[in-house]
Design a protein with these regions (language model features):
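Short, glycine/charge-rich flexible loops or terminal/linker lids adjacent to PRPP-binding catalytic cores
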Residues: 1-25, 31-41
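Acidic beta-strand-to-loop metal/phosphate-binding motif
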Residues: 24-27, 71-73
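A short acidic, glycine/proline-enriched capping/turn motif at secondary-structure boundaries
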Residues: 30-31, 77
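PRPP-dependent phosphoribosyltransferase catalytic core
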Residues: 41-137
Length: 137
């Protein structure tokens, strides 16, 4: 099995073929869900176009259908502005959230240029990795 980590896909350059693959979309947070909705929609469209270009009808050859799953670190408990298909969202094998969290702003260390400031803000918000429970702070 080969794992490809990709942010923006240039199909020509990377020779990436989505047809018949299992694709996992990964994001830090399911906030408004608009990013996940957009990413899924675009990848589904790309997979369909690639299958058509190869003359593959996935309704007749179901094993060539591209399967999508989604993993997020944090699923914010709030109304979403966009939807995901029930076949993904309601399937525990296709939608994974490491943790459901309140609707707060979460700062991730890979987005910070100043780790000291980031850590201070994380502690202030009750999101320090050394504490299991916000009440311990």
């Amino acid at each position: 099995m080969k794992i490809n980590r990709t942010q923006w896909i240039d199909y020509e350059q990377c020779k990436l073929d989505l047809v018949g693959k299992n694709v996992l979309i990964v994001d830090e947070v399911d906030d408004t869900r608009t990013t996940l909705h957009y990413a899924l929609h675009e990848l589904e469209k790309d997979a369909k176009e690639q299958a058509e270009a190869k003359g593959i009808d996935v309704s007749k050859i179901p094993e060539m259908k591209t399967n999508f799953g989604i993993f997020v670190l944090h699923d914010k408990l709030k109304p979403k502005k966009a939807d995901l298909p029930d076949e993904i969202l309601l399937d525990e094998n296709r939608y994974f959230a490491a943790k459901q969290v309140p609707d707060k702003w979460y700062a991730y260390p890979w987005e910070s240029t100043d780790i000291v400031y980031h850590t201070k803000m994380a502690i202030k918000q009750g999101n320090d990795i050394f504490f299991e429970n916000e009440d311990e702070i």
